[in-house]
Regions:
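C-terminal catalytic histidine-bearing segment of alpha/beta-hydrolase fold enzymes
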Residues: 106-111, 240-293
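Short beta-strand element of the alpha/beta-hydrolase
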Residues: 59-67
Length: 293
């Protein structure tokens, strides 16, 4: 009888360990769940957003838009790594896999014949993502009035478009080494072609309408802006154009231009330079100050 009780006790312990492990896995899955932001709407697109929900901390939410010239996404370095970093610092993040033109559009130029993915598709996705988070704020444990957006490279252009062209109700935007202008000698041509489409890339009117530096207004929320002087992909003057426009319109913002770091370092602890990797610490200081204002 005694030996049977001794056998039962370890079995119960193992069962409790298994149950605990299953519950932990469910929590992890919940904290990193994927949703189709267009599900249940008239739009039949499948655009995924991955939630990285913070435990405790602030009730702020940040939509993360990876870069990739509006052709593809750096979903790891500028998406999921960023989401995990924000989550680990008490900020819930939502990594958006917004629509892009794709590799085939880049190589085959098929959009000369077919529409394909182009403006305003990605902006529509960001708009819907913002509305989706607002509608599900209680479920996610975030504040519906405390949603910001962070974008890298072309994703930086996207989040800036959200607050300038759509006046999305975002509390801040953080463009990191962003594409800003669609005109002139500082334009990132690959992003422009991907965004506008092969048939419309030469439209002066459309280029002007999507050049962010021309559309900053008093309704723009606070901005955290970072770039590097040695950026070999997106000319550093893009960020300087944005900084000038924000200054002219008295928009609260912090602009940090590092001498070294290049482009595409995201939230990495190894890419870029030791100097530019300080942007993450600077952002956390900035966002915490913003929350107290």
């Amino acid at each position: 009888m005694k030996s049977e009780r001794m056998r039962i006790k370890p079995m119960k312990q193992r069962l409790m360990i298994i149950i605990g492990f299953v519950l932990l896995c469910l929590q992890i899955l919940k904290a990193q769940e994927k949703v189709n932001i267009w599900q249940g709407t008239a739009c039949r697109k499948n655009v995924e957003m991955t939630a990285y929900l913070a435990k405790g901390g602030s009730k702020m939410a940040v939509i993360v838009c990876p870069g990739g010239s509006y052709l593809w996404h750096d979903m790891n370095g500028e998406g999921h790594e960023v989401g995990k970093w924000l989550q680990n610092n008490g900020i819930s993040a939502f990594v958006l896999h917004y629509r892009t033109a794709g590799f085939m559009a880049f190589f085959l130029h098929y959009r000369l014949l077919f529409r394909g993915v182009r403006y305003p598709d990605a902006l529509d996705d960001l708009t819907q993502a913002t509305l989706y988070i607002k509608e599900h704020a209680r479920e996610y444990g975030v504040c519906s009035d405390s949603i910001g957006a962070m974008g890298f490279s072309a994703g930086g252009h996207l989040v800036l478009s959200g607050v300038t062209l759509r006046q999305l109700p975002l509390t801040f935007v953080a463009p990191i080494y962003p594409v800003v202008t669609m005109n002139g000698k500082y334009v990132h041509k690959r992003s422009r072609r991907a965004l506008l489409g092969d048939n419309r890339k030469n439209s002066r009117l459309l280029r002007d309408s999507l050049s962010i530096e021309h559309h900053i207004s008093a309704s723009c929320p606070p901005v955290f802006l970072v770039n590097c002087k040695d950026d070999p992909i997106v000319k550093y003057q893009n960020s300087e154009l944005l900084d000038s426009a924000l200054t002219v319109h008295n928009i609260p913002h912090q602009y940090i231009q590092y001498k070294t770091g290049g482009h595409g370092f995201g939230a990495s602890d190894t890419k870029g330079s030791p100097e530019c990797r300080q942007w993450k610490k600077e952002f956390l200081v900035w966002i915490r100050k913003l929350q107290t204002q």
